[in-house]
Amino acid sequence: MKIDPNKEKALNAVLGQIEKQFGKGSIMKLGEDRSMDVETISTGSLALDVALGAGGLPMGRIVEIYGPESSGKTTLTLEVIAAAQKQGKTCAFIDAEHALDPIYAKKLGVDIDNLLCSQPDTGEQALEICDALTRSGAVDVIVVDSVAALTPKAEIEGEIGDSHMGLAARMMSQAMRKLAGNLKQSNTLLIFINQIRMKIGVMFGNPETTTGGNALKFYASVRLDIRRTGAIKDREEVIGNETRVKVVKNKIAAPFKQAEFQILYGQGINSTGELVDLGVQHKLIEKAGAWYSYKGDKIGQGRANAGKYLIENPAISDEIETTLRAMLLGNGEKVSADSADTAGDNIDLETGEVF
């Protein structure tokens, strides 16, 4: 498409002004084939890392992960913590819901002996702890579970039934203003888990909204909408969930991508199954009938056995993952078998949410 030279000059000038005023990545072309040069931490899902465009969640930023109950929100954050700890990073978990299961966290690969954990009494206390950890510069990843459980002190000290209109929203708004700059200075990743509520009286459009007001929506560099789309069965027994994650906001790469993966009960994200699928799609792994082969050697009959082979042979698994990351992220390719553009979806112009 040809653009008038004068208009192009004016456009470049205003884009430069916007980036200078609001920071790099505040505006970009939707199809632009680049991502911000930021340090990232893997989500545990290669498809989601690709959908994010930068290879994972960005350091020094605020991330919001929201979805219905039992959709995999906490599991996803624990996978991020496990990946960060493998890189030698220090992580903290602010358990406002008082529901963290250390046994499950350990199964997902989290080093619970070195994971900092706090169960605050009030929302203000939780956010002050976040701020103190951030300003220390010693903590790399902080997870808050969840925004809905950050109860203002006035509400806790009051009686059930008392009206506390807008208290949580004001508390979150003040915290965001305080935290955003400190996170950038200390290069700390702050992840908020959030719950979904329904707006009353919405006749058209999406009635869903998240708790804690609008401040978090604006301050978050990445917002992920996670949903359970189906059940994984072994004969009659349900052993996991089919999961879809939509990147509804992304300030480090183009947004509105999505990824699909499996979460297995007691194991977390089925990363080896994902490697098999992506390997076949990108012709890294050969599939002949039910048999899967890698570099001429058979690795298993059926997807489950091929995945089991990769678990038993971590060196080969790492080699396949490294090659896939170079193919999908190194040359800018952003769409995979499990990540697709959602341009056909409806977009809430006020919040930027896809529904």
UniProtKB/Swiss-Prot annotation:
CDD domains: RecA. ATP binds at residues 67-74. It comes from the Bacteria. InterPro entries: AAA+_ATPase, DNA_recomb/repair_RecA, DNA_recomb/repair_RecA_CS, P-loop_NTPase, RecA-like_C, RecA-like_N, RecA_ATP-bd, RecA_C_sf. Keywords: ATP-binding, Cytoplasm, DNA damage, DNA recombination, DNA repair, DNA-binding, Nucleotide-binding, SOS response. Gene3D superfamilies: P-loop containing nucleotide triphosphate hydrolases (3.40.50.300). Its main location: cytoplasm. GO terms for molecular function: ATP binding; ATP hydrolysis activity; ATP-dependent DNA damage sensor activity; damaged DNA binding; single-stranded DNA binding. The keyword Nucleotide-binding applies. HAMAP family: RecA. Can catalyze the hydrolysis of ATP in the presence of single-stranded DNA, the ATP-dependent uptake of single-stranded DNA by duplex DNA, and the ATP-dependent hybridization of homologous single-stranded DNAs. It interacts with LexA causing its activation and leading to its autocatalytic cleavage. This is Protein RecA. The lineage of its organism: Bacteria, Pseudomonadati, Pseudomonadota, Gammaproteobacteria, Alteromonadales. The gene is recA.
